[in-house]
Amino acid sequence: MTDKLAVNRNTFDQVILPVYAPAQFIPVKGKGSRVWDQQGTEYIDFAGGIAVTALGHCHPALVSALHQQGETLWHTSNVFTNEPALRLAQKLIAATFADRVFFANSGAEANEAAFKLARHYAIERHSPYKTKIIAFHNAFHGRTLFTVSVGGQPKYSDGFGPKPADIIHVPFNDLAAVKAVMDDHTCAVVLEPIQGEGGITSATPEFLQGVRALCDQHNALLVFDEVQSGMGRSGKLFSYMHYGVTPDILTTAKALGGGFPISAMLTTEEIASVMTVGTHGTTYGGNPLACAVAEAALDVINTPEVLNGIEQRHGLFVQALQSINSKYDVFSDIRGMGLLIGAELTAKYRGQAREFLAAAAANGLMILNAGPDVLRLAPSLVIELEDIQQGMARLEKAMASVIKG
């Protein structure tokens, strides 16, 4: 047995590439919506690993699936297929518009596959010049050079040399702006139905319906990035289901594995038909371990018991945020859908989101930010109502400590 080296938060600063600024405590154990650090301090988790642990920490169904598959078969590569991947694909197809699935390991990989597919389809079916991608300011689609370029945030994409060409960014929820740049050279419009990193901003129904119509008019594909908004987060299995607008390609990750790395790209038979052996691939994508856990997660999440409880929990969070705001006048807007909630700070506290995060941690609560001005809550979809009540009391105490100095 390998001896475990003693590590602490200082170790991070010595050995990890300095691209993160993690909290000063190290979580070591989680159960449900509770987490404990190295010192045994307990936290209530409203962060969900950035909308990943949709069933909380160490959910029994996921632990059982991982344990059972871990004793059976770990990895084969895609030289062979495997039963968990085929079962998971069947269930995703049955639950959505899709006919075909591609599995990968992260949201960025799923989006990379989606963008490549969109261009390849346009070139094969229409024209070698049909390569324009229309995307949106403040979007986030991943960290590969292609996905970070499609994401509309220069702070993430600048500084790495030439970017992939023919990507246009316009304001989100602005149909006229899309129409102004849309033409027959457009291969795809790419968007998040709920912008996550961009501040928890939901698309309007009119916007999505209008974009769908423009895509149909110009033979362009509509790509929905549901990496963060999917798998029940919005109150439906995927957020497109709220709008009556069906994409041509959809990506999902984060909560798909409930904490185990896996992602998927979903599309139709017609679009998938342009791909042949070798046009895309991955070594780990669709591995038996990940797919077994994801199948268990999907089986639990895609039930009335879970999905019907999300709106009640949403209401409790919003009510508590409104109560805090009535006392401290700290939020200019409280928004979001289901259990992806954003609270935008007023001008007085603009830029202080991370200060509020630190105060929350000091009071035994894990929350997120979505940019410098928005507090983000993305808890377990099955979080206990008592945990919501206690956690929001801790948040109020944390907010007061910052506001009162």
Swiss-Prot record:
Record-listed E.C. numbers: 2.6.1.11, 2.6.1.17
Alphabetical list of Gene3D superfamilies matching this protein: Aspartate Aminotransferase, domain 1, Type I PLP-dependent aspartate aminotransferase-like (Major domain)
PTM-bearing positions, type N6-(pyridoxal phosphate)lysine: K254
Main location: cytoplasm
Compartment annotation: Cytoplasm
Function, in words: Involved in both the arginine and lysine biosynthetic pathways.
Protein name: Acetylornithine/succinyldiaminopimelate aminotransferase
